[in-house]
Amino acid sequence: MNSIEFPLLNQTTQNSVISTTSNDLSNWSRLSSLWPLLYGTSCCFIEFASLIGSRFDFDRYGLVPRSSPRQADLILTAGTVTMKMAPSLVRLYEQMPEPKYVIAMGACTITGGMFSTDSYSTVRGVDKLIPVDVYLPGCPPKPEAVIDAITKLRKKVSREIYEDRVGSQQETRCFTINHKFRVGRSTHTGNYDQGLLYQSPSISEIPYENETFLKYKIAVSSHKLVN
């Protein structure tokens, strides 16, 4: 059995029979076979490649790297994401079947890193494009930190409830526990809010300089006649 604890797990009745729920059984099967899609763009991905060797042996977690997003349920982004690469990353995420998860690995992926300083072509955080489940800081993170991030993601999967996940998918585009998205008004429809635009004052509100000057001149003339 997996070492992950389930909150809804009942007591063991016999040595070969375990009483549990279908939701916990589904979560256990998914966390034991996470298939990641590796999206590496810079040096952070080299640290993840060291997990393939026998020293860390990431096969013990059921990780099977896939080259197609349609066969993956986890995308691991490592490295800088540029504006030109952003549409491709979002397209890969949308092609992944539900439920799906994201691990942001490295400072360049989380905040843009040193490449985002005074740069117009770098995305300052991958969470501006896709929802992130686990943040993994470091430049670059150690392989032990990657294993810890995967362990935290497995614990998160074990606590998910199917009804909450389905209800959230009906309201928003994606589901995560850390991020609470809400449907907002689109700003790229071409229709701008007229209240935010500059409105020039009407002609009646503009004071006429000649009219003011004539009133002043008439007042001065009448004052002289009285004297």
Swiss-Prot record:
One GO process term, biological-process aspect: aerobic respiration
Binding site for [4Fe-4S] cluster: 43-44, 108, 139
GO CC, alphabetical: chloroplast thylakoid membrane; respiratory chain complex I
Coiled coil: none
Cofactor binding comment, as recorded: Binds 1 [4Fe-4S] cluster.
PROSITE patterns, per database record: COMPLEX1_20K
Known catalytic reactions: a plastoquinone + NADH + (n+1) H(+)(in) = a plastoquinol + NAD(+) + n H(+)(out); a plastoquinone + NADPH + (n+1) H(+)(in) = a plastoquinol + NADP(+) + n H(+)(out)
Essential cofactor(s): [4Fe-4S] cluster
Membrane topology type: Peripheral membrane protein
GO MF: 4 iron, 4 sulfur cluster binding; iron ion binding; NADH dehydrogenase (ubiquinone) activity; quinone binding
Assigned keywords, A-Z: 4Fe-4S, Chloroplast, Iron, Iron-sulfur, Membrane, Metal-binding, NAD, NADP, Plastid, Plastoquinone, Quinone, Thylakoid, Translocase, Transport
Cell location: Plastid, Chloroplast thylakoid membrane
Domain of life: Eukaryota
EC number: 7.1.1.-
Pfam families named among the record's database cross-references: Oxidored_q6
Presence of keyword Chloroplast: yes
Main location: plastid
Family: Belongs to the complex I 20 kDa subunit family.
Assembly with partners or alone: NDH is composed of at least 16 different subunits, 5 of which are encoded in the nucleus.
Entry function: NDH shuttles electrons from NAD(P)H:plastoquinone, via FMN and iron-sulfur (Fe-S) centers, to quinones in the photosynthetic chain and possibly in a chloroplast respiratory chain. The immediate electron acceptor for the enzyme in this species is believed to be plastoquinone. Couples the redox reaction to proton translocation, and thus conserves the redox energy in a proton gradient.
PANTHER family to which the protein is assigned, alphabetical: NADH DEHYDROGENASE, NADH DEHYDROGENASE [UBIQUINONE] IRON-SULFUR PROTEIN 7, MITOCHONDRIAL
UniProt protein name: NAD(P)H-quinone oxidoreductase subunit K, chloroplastic
Species, as recorded: Ranunculus macranthus (Large buttercup)
Gene symbol of the encoding locus: ndhK
